[in-house]
Amino acid sequence: LSIRRQRQMCIRDRTMEQMNGLVAVNSLMAMVGGTLAAFLAGKNDPGYVHNGPLAGLVAVCAGSNVMHPLGALITGVVAGFIFVKAFALTQNKWKIDDVLGVWPLHGLCGVWGGLAAGIFGLKALGGMGGVSFMSQLIGTGLGVAIALTGGFLIYCLLYTSDAADE
């Protein structure tokens, strides 16, 4: 009982000023998870190993103030694997020219992070609470819809202006 209370005091009973430590620890845990996953899944490829920590950081941003550090580590691990697999798929199978891996790194890992905040932010999993998976799912879906709409409109604008120039 006392260990459980200590853990609750460490995480749940914090003021906003005290949250900075939790955010810093969660950021580091996600970086470690992303690095390890990219190292394992990317077979020690330097490009993957360098982007693994970024994948973890991008993913944990949505929930760094509500997750337990173990949840942040898991979020980073999953993001590292997502980045390696999606980057390889984009480059090798789909032949899409995304040399820096912006779409898998920021797009897919960001979507995972939005959903992970709704999972690992729950009090039942050691998080701070105040979030729900459904709210995160809806918010992430709306963010993706807005990004796709904006990207499509800009593509159409550039495509028609290129046709007029030729």
Predicted features by range, described:
Residues L1-R7, I11, Y159-E166:
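Single conserved hydrophobic/aromatic residue that forms the stacking wall/gate
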Residues R12-Q18, A62-L70:
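Helix-coil boundary and interhelical linker segments in multi-pass alpha-helical membrane proteins
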Residues M19-A24, V49, I96-P104:
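The feature identifies polytopic integral membrane transport proteins across all domains of life
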Residues M19-A30, G71-V77:
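Structural signature of hydrophobic alpha-helical transmembrane segments
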Residues A30-F39, K43, G56-V60, S64, ...:
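Transmembrane alpha-helical segments of multi-pass membrane transport proteins and ion-pumping complexes
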Residues G47-L54:
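Cytoplasmic-side transmembrane-helix entry/capping segments in multi-pass membrane proteins
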Residues P69-I74, T90-L100:
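A cytosolic-side transmembrane-helix exit/cap motif
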Residues G127-A145:
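Structural signal for the N-terminal portions of transmembrane helices
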